[in-house]
Swiss-Prot record:
The lineage of its organism: Bacteria, Pseudomonadati, Pseudomonadota, Alphaproteobacteria, Rickettsiales. One of its GO terms (cellular component) is cytosol. CDD domains: GluRS_core. Monomer. GO terms for biological process: glutamyl-tRNA aminoacylation. It catalyses: tRNA(Glu) + L-glutamate + ATP = L-glutamyl-tRNA(Glu) + AMP + diphosphate. Keywords: Aminoacyl-tRNA synthetase, ATP-binding, Cytoplasm, Ligase, Nucleotide-binding, Protein biosynthesis. This is Glutamate--tRNA ligase 2. It comes from Rickettsia massiliae (strain Mtu5). It is found in: Cytoplasm. Catalyzes the attachment of glutamate to tRNA(Glu) in a two-step reaction: glutamate is first activated by ATP to form Glu-AMP and then transferred to the acceptor end of tRNA(Glu). Coiled coil: none annotated. It is an enzyme of class 6 (ligase). HAMAP family: Glu_tRNA_synth_type1. A motif ('HIGH' region) lies at residues 11-21.
């Protein structure tokens, strides 16, 4: 099937949009776009207990952020049960399925018995071939597939090759529950057929499902879509990706400061290649993508490579875009903190602008930033970076950029230029300030106060003079000065920062000591 290609992404809305699921969506999107076909979105929410509206919105926002736009309306399985029920009854009428009245307790008893006997358990229902005339009337049955007892099922996988499963290893799976709702297996097959899916591209953890679904396809007499089961993403240690390996959800990567173009490029290269090309735009990916270039081995998540790739895409943005994105994150996280503080009753009535009146944003690890805000009786309702501060950030952007691999790192450095908020000192900076020569800092303040020209070169020359007068090297003076001005121990050039912020702001920060 190559004409009128239709692929689908079919996540279960039970949590975040997993990074592995995002890659699956990307591959389906690229394959469809490469063939001028359709990329459809289906929400598999048949499990009512685990499915949430919040998870659905997370899936939508994650796909939109990545730029993976789908065709047509979203299909919700929870709204299609009548279609599934009709399909199950059709199999029943054709002798391909049967009513089963066996209780779950009896099935569990048989399962436990097989376990005790160290036997592989396949449930064989006593109702498979019984005459309907003896069906009990006081028990609601399930509908089970009448899987062939003999022969085998062959999965023709474009990546894995031919995978043969003996029918004796496939149970008579439930198609319709006793309450009339469809199971995942039935819904998937009916939907793929009804939606006209031509190619199924998904993780190889679905390979066992494929055999069971193939049995349903055969029972209906449906044409089977082309199947491609791709290896899962693993952690750097080679184990299956889990929380201990780092971020799992797409939204988290967004919060960590990765660009969507960068993440798509990185995910594309996890299991697919085009020669030695590493930097691949979405346009190129659509032109080049094919199933023949998929790898058979699991790919390992590598944050160093991800950061390197993201740094490349950051440098492709112009100054205005970088400044705009940085300011947006600053405002989002400041306002997130304000909303959080609005519920902190222990700070009500605290009017002192002292250390005790600050709360560290590090308590909220999801932002990744280290803001502190003064607390007064009335917290500001909304924080906004001033036009002056935006100007500072824009001017400093080239030097901030060379030290950043993500927008979050860029934003952390940009805090240096927020002159209307208190300076933030990290722990190392605090130690340097506590142990520094206070008299030397006073000399620095006095000398800088006398400067008429406060450009980078003039400030640097003045520091050289101070160092010489005290028989010191420039590197002996700069650590505490840097700590006081930036709150950090590593930053862009202090002389450049001084030129951008100006004398008044620099002296204000130095005088804190």
């Amino acid at each position: 099937m190559t004409n009128n290609v239709i692929t689908r992404f079919a996540p279960s809305p039970s949590g975040f949009l997993h990074i592995g699921s995002a890659r699956t969506a990307l591959f389906n999107y690229l394959f469809a776009r490469h063939h001028n076909g359709k990329f459809l979105l289906r929400i598999e929410d048949t499990d009512k207990e685990r499915s949430t509206k919040e998870a659905v919105e997370t899936i939508f926002s994650g796909l939109k952020w990545l730029g993976l736009d789908w065709n047509g309306e979203v299909i919700f399985q929870s709204k299609r049960n009548n279609l599934y029920k009709e399909a199950a009854l059709k199999l029943l009428q054709n002798g391909k399925a049967y009513y089963c009245f066996t209780s779950q307790e009896e099935i569990e008893r048989q399962r436990q018995q097989a376990l005790e006997n160290k036997q592989h358990f396949i449930f064989n229902s006593e109702w498979r071939d019984k005459d309907p005339s003896i069906y009990p009337t006081d028990i609601k049955p399930v509908i089970r597939l009448k899987t062939p007892r003999e022969g085998s099922i062959t999965i023709h996988d474009t990546l894995q090759g031919e995978v043969v499963i003996e029918n004796s290893h496939i149970d008579d799976m439930v198609l319709l529950r006793a309450d009339g709702t469809a199971t995942y297996m039935l819904a998937v097959v009916v939907d793929d057929h009804d939606m006209g899916i031509t190619h199924i591209i998904r993780g190889d953890d679905h390979l066992t499902n494929a055999a069971r679904q193939l049995a349903i396809y055969q029972a209906f007499g449906y044409e089977v879509p082309s199947m491609t089961h791709i290896p899962l993403i693993h952690g750097a240690d080679g184990a299956k990706l889990s929380k201990r390996h780092g971020a799992l959800g797409v939204e988290t990567y967004k919060d960590m400061g990765y660009l969507p173009e960068s993440l798509c490029n990185y995910l594309l290269r996890l299991g697919w290649s085009h020669g030695d090309d590493e930097i691949i735009s979405m346009t190129q990916a659509i032109d080049w993508f094919n199933l023949d270039s998929l790898g058979k081995s699991p790919s390992k998540l590598d944050f160093a490579k991800m950061n390197s790739l993201n740094a490349h895409y950051l440098r492709m943005l112009d100054n205005d875009s970088l400044t705009s994105k940085t300011v947006e994150i600053l405002e989002q996280n400041y306002n997130k903190l304000l909303r959080k503080l609005a519920y902190r009753k222990e700070f009500e009535g605290n009017t002192e602008r002292s250390t005790a009146a600050y709360i560290d944003i590090r308590e909220d690890a999801s932002t990744g930033l280290t803001y502190k805000l003064p607390l007064t009786v009335e917290l500001p309702k909304k924080f906004k970076v001033s036009e002056q501060e935006i100007g500072y950030i824009k001017q400093a952007m080239p030097s901030l950029l060379v030290r950043s691999a993500t927008l979050l790192e860029l934003t952390r450095l940009a805090q240096i230029y927020l002159v209307d908020s208190p300076i933030i000192y990290n722990q190392d900076a605090k130690k340097i300030i506590e142990n520094c020569d206070k008299n030397l800092i006073k000399q620095v303040i006095e000398n800088l106060s006398e400067l008429e020209q406060f450009d980078k070169e003039s400030v640097q020359n003045k520091f050289k003079e101070i160092a010489a007068a005290n028989d010191l090297k420039l590197n002996d003076i700069m650590p505490p000065v840097r700590a006081l001005i930036t709150g950090m121990t590593a930053s862009p050039s202090v002389f450049e920062i001084a030129e951008i912020l100006g004398k008044e702001n620099i002296l204000k920060r130095l005088k804190i000591i």
